[in-house]
Amino acid sequence: MKTSFLLLGLTLVLSSLNAQSAKEEVDFMQSVFGMGKKALVAEFVKPGAAQKDAFWQLYDEYEMARKELGKKRIELLLKYEENFDNLSNELAAVLLKEIQALTMKNDKLVASYVKKVSKATDPVVAMQFHQIEMYLLSEIRISIASSLPYPEIKQ
């Protein structure tokens, strides 16, 4: 529920961004979402007492890297929005390639931290982390995809 509210807020803010204030708005929303997300992750990921420090240190590292990828995704979304009315095949191909590369980087980031969490804690904690992270990433991807205008072939 918290995540849905945060995603709705993020979507509303993103839809009203202009190029000059985009960076500040993105930083603000990421910090708000990050705080709420960490509380949500804490509800689902249950490392043992001896594992907590190691898990949360890795989680914070992961979040820093994920936020950088998130900023790049927002830049791509803004580029798509700015060029939507005049979207050429060439620009569509470039954007698609960048989006696919970013999605792969994000998925590789999750996989690398699942391994790190498993090694620093145990496989059950790693599975908990993976499950909640995949759920949240899927929700974000669905929210973004459903709010984007669908490109049409221009004749």
Regions found by a protein language model. Give the residues of each.
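Intrinsically disordered, low-complexity segments enriched in polar/charged small residues
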Residues: 7, 17-19, 42, 71, ...
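Amphipathic, charged alpha-helical segments and their helix-to-coil junctions
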Residues: 25-28, 32-35, 39, 44, ...
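Bacterial Sec-dependent N-terminal signal peptides
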Residues: 1-24
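Amphipathic alpha-helical segments
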Residues: 26, 40-120
